[in-house]
Amino acid sequence: MSTAEETTGGEIEPWEEVTPDAARRLLVAAVEAFAERGYHATTTRDIAGRAGMSPAALYIHYKTKEELLHRISRIGHDRALAILRTAAEGAGTPAQRLAEAVGSFVRWHAGRRTTARVVQYELEALGPDARAEILALRRQVDAEVRGIIEEGVASGEFDVLDIHGTTLAVLSLCIDVARWFNVDGPRTPDEVGALYADLVLRMVGAEKQPPPAPAGNGS
């Protein structure tokens, strides 16, 4: 396998931070198996077989099956947080930044749906320490979206009575895309991202706005 590993349904996930190649192959195999069968129904033998390796080879790189899930969850949440943080810290009005945050977050959950299903829906399989670490990342994800909504409310751009509840609704809407998105369906990840960005702007009472002008535009 190359650095750009292929997972279920033609999805491409780089996993460039996972080395050496054997560890990467095992992680990709674990993503596929967990997404297809669920964490508890998957054995280390299943994972090793998908990677074309022996069960003993798995333990050279990962002490337990849970360590694999923790690694997948950590990388996935780090990427999700980076996507939202980039949008939140970008140029533009709160509406423009919220649209970018939602659009990007949805595109990731659609385009990386196999990974996202494992990252988002296997939290309870982690042990207490690993779960606490991932929950802390989820609180940061929540804070990025909530911060944009708070700015929009403060500026009068958004009409939101319950910021906490609205933040939860926005994130739930985005995350659920990983559950139903089908690469053979009628919409691409970009199209679903644009649709959901528009829906969320309506949810917060904002008018749809054009993206911010590129930096250095002299107009």
Question: What annotation goes with each model-predicted range?
Answer:
Residues 27, 81, 99, 103, ...:
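An amphipathic alpha-helix signature
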Residues 116-121, 131, 135, 153-199, ...:
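Hydrophobic/aromatic-rich alpha-helical bundle segments in the mid-to-C-terminal region
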Residues 1-21, 32, 208-219:
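N-terminal intrinsically disordered/low-complexity leader segments
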Residues 2, 22-25, 29, 33-67, ...:
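Helix-turn-helix
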Residues 71, 85-114, 167-170, 193, ...:
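Hydrophobic alpha-helical connector segments
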Residues 74-79:
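Short, basic, alpha-helical segments at the C-terminal edge of helix-turn-helix-like DNA-binding modules
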Residues 62, 121-126:
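Short helix-capping/turn signature of helix-turn-helix
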